[in-house]
């Protein structure tokens, strides 16, 4: 049987990335909560910066 989690970085970025979070009011709330908590990474895409 095929497992349900089939990871793809593009899909991960597009669904949970920084710009996606900024697009909605609740997403911005998520980011501000993570800033307030002092998270090292705010979102998925901030970790996956291309060099």
UniProtKB/Swiss-Prot annotation:
PROSITE patterns reported for this sequence: RIBOSOMAL_L34
Gene3D superfamilies hit by this protein: 1.10.287.3980
Keyword Transmembrane helix: no
Source organism of this protein record: Chlorobium chlorochromatii (strain CaD3)
Domain of life: Bacteria
NCBIfam families linked to this entry: rpmH_bact
GO molecular function per UniProt: structural constituent of ribosome
Family: Belongs to the bacterial ribosomal protein bL34 family.
GO CC term (a single one): ribonucleoprotein complex
BP-aspect Gene Ontology terms: translation
Xref: Pfam families: Ribosomal_L34 (PF00468)
Comp. bias (Polar residues): 42-51
Basic residues bias: start-end ranges: 1-19, 26-40
Protein name from the UniProt record: Large ribosomal subunit protein bL34
Classification via PANTHER family: LARGE RIBOSOMAL SUBUNIT PROTEIN BL34M (PTHR14503:SF4), MITOCHONDRIAL RIBOSOMAL PROTEIN 34 FAMILY MEMBER (PTHR14503)
Region described as Disordered: 1-51
Record key words, sorted: Ribonucleoprotein, Ribosomal protein
Phylogenetic placement of the source organism: Bacteria, Pseudomonadati, Chlorobiota, Chlorobiia, Chlorobiales
